[in-house]
């Protein structure tokens, strides 16, 4: 069990996915190798397989819980309406779907969970991690607003990147 950090089986016989654990990456026992993804349609390929199944289950192995709110799991991260739409949601597979498939982003709550879990894990053992010189974007501050419920609104934001990297904007309700 010491020769790998994470294990995940890919199949084509149906059954969906199961991480086998939450946050077990690099564990000393065999729980880190219990992940499986085998889509119901028997076609283990394409964006739907990669995002809705594989990355979702690996997200569990890295420490992320579900973000959908169609049922409360008492994890404190059930942030998204209905089935949710980000990677750790259940888009397209509940009776409260808001979209047929996930979008390829983690919710901020998932990122926070994974970032909190990884430093507690004993990996990568004996390896040196080299930080890059990439700098985070600088977000222009905006004032806070309170608007009445059901009021239509538009969100506008701006930021600059010290490295000149392209910027993608994403708003989440929290």
Q: Where do the model's predicted regions map?
A:
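Extracellular (secreted or membrane-anchored) zinc-dependent metallopeptidases
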Residues: 1-174
């Amino acid at each position: 069990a010491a020769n790998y950090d994470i294990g995940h089986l890919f199949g084509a016989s149906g059954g969906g996915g199961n991480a086998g654990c939450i946050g077990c990456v690099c564990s000393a026992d065999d729980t880190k190798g219990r992940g499986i993804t085998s889509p119901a349609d028997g076609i283990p390929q394409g964006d739907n397989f990669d995002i809705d199944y594989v990355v979702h289950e690996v997200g569990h192995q890295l420490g992320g819980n579900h973000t959908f709110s169609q049922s409360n799991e008492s994890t404190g991260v059930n942030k998204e309406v209905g089935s949710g739409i980000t990677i750790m949601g259940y888009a397209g597979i509940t009776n409260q779907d808001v979209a047929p498939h996930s979008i390829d982003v983690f919710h901020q709550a998932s990122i926070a969970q994974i970032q909190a879990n990884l430093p507690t894990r004993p990996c990568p053992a004996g390896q040196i991690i080299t930080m890059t010189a990439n700098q985070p974007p600088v977000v222009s501050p905006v004032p806070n607003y309170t608007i009445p419920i059901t009021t239509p609104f538009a969100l506008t934001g701006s930021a600059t990147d010290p490295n000149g990297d392209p910027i993608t904007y994403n708003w989440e309700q929290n």
